[in-house]
Amino acid sequence: MTDDVGDFQENWFEHNVPRWREWLGSFSGRTGLRALEIGSFEGRSTLWLCENILTADDARIDCVDFFAPDPVYGDYHARFRQNTAAHRAKIREHAGASFDMLRKLEGPYDIVYVDGWHSAFGALADGVMAWPLLKVGGVMIFDDYLWVPPKLGEPEKPSGLSRRLTKLRGGDWRREARLRQIDSVAVDTPKLGVDGLLATLRGYHEVIGSDYQLAVRKTRGFDQGQVGHDT
């Protein structure tokens, strides 16, 4: 479909904007700002970053994606280029698998957005390779933290009594039902990989937001001595 900002077939991003303003607003307009996006698709998130955060003339974003025709979504690369044409000078495209492209990139980045392979291994691998590229103080956002394969459908709605009891103890039945779905197919969802990565980075990050997406701020880096001698 064509909307008021470009040619898009899907809109999987706009509902994230309020949280992105909260998580990334302090970066807006900074000179020398650098962002890395793993999974760019039609360019909605790329466009939003260019228009709202990467507004300085020297701000740049590296976009990693296969950028190849897809049997379901067609030539989304052409739509990406059309939708982001006004910001072409800020964008560098890296066409290929993330595990090939990320090893060629040099940090540091202020912002990293991970929206690649929707599996535990894929999310873990992208996070492991991108984390060293993130600045201390930078923000990494994982998309689809609570994603489940579409074949599972919507979570089953519990009884009214069960919902009331969940609410009384401060829970959210929808989230809890979704988490049970995720547990049933954990290796096929990003959450297991993201949780595994962050477990290894305890003391090096703080979670700044967790819902369908999860965002963390890097609070410490690995010093050279630690990397070289902890063997």
Walk through the language-model features, giving the residues of each.
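S-adenosylmethionine/decaboxylated-SAM
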Residues: 2-231
